[in-house]
Amino acid sequence: MKIEIGTIFPSHFKSSYPEEFELFSHFETTSGIPTAFFAVMGGLYQHTHTYANIQREACFGINFLPVSCYDRLINTIRGNEYEADEFQAGGFTVQDAKTIHAPMIQEAFINMECTLKDIQDLSGAGITAMVIGQVQHISVDEEYAQGYEKRYGKDGFMMLIPAPQDLKTGEPAQSAVATVNIERLD
C-alpha cells in the first residue's frame, strides 16, 4: 500500500522548526529529496521517445526503484524500440497516476507525478536537455514512509555514476551504480 500526498498540505505534518513549511515545500519531507517541489532531470537526450513524450504530453512521472531492480531497468533500455512496451520488457506493473496522464511503475518505492514547467537545451546543439517539472503528487510505499532505513541504503535511492577517466593515464573506467547512505544526522 502507498501513502498518497498531494499539493494540499497534510494537516498531520509537524514541523521540525518554526517556519519550516513556509520556507520549504512539504514535498521535500514527503520524498526525502531536497527541493522536491520541482523535479529536475538534467542531461535527458533529446533524440529519445521519453523526451518526445514529455514534450507532447506536458507531464511525466519519476519512479524510484531500489538497486535490486537495476537489471530490469537495463532490460527496458535494451528493448527500447518506439513500439516496445518498456514496462513489459522490465517486468514492471503499470499503475495509473493520480493527477497526470502518464503511466507509473507500481514496484517503485516513490512515484512523483509532475507537470512540465520548462525544457532547456543544455548542449545548445539539440543533444541533451534539462527538463523541469512541477510536482503535483507523490506516492510513497508504506515500508518507506518512516525514517531513513529503507530510503537510504541498499534498498533505497540509487544513482548511476558515469565512468571516471583516469586522469593520469587517460584510460576509461567502468560506470557504477551507487546507493545513498546516511553518514550523520544534522
Identify the residue ranges that each predicted region occupies.
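Basic, polyanion-binding surface patches
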Residues: M1-D186
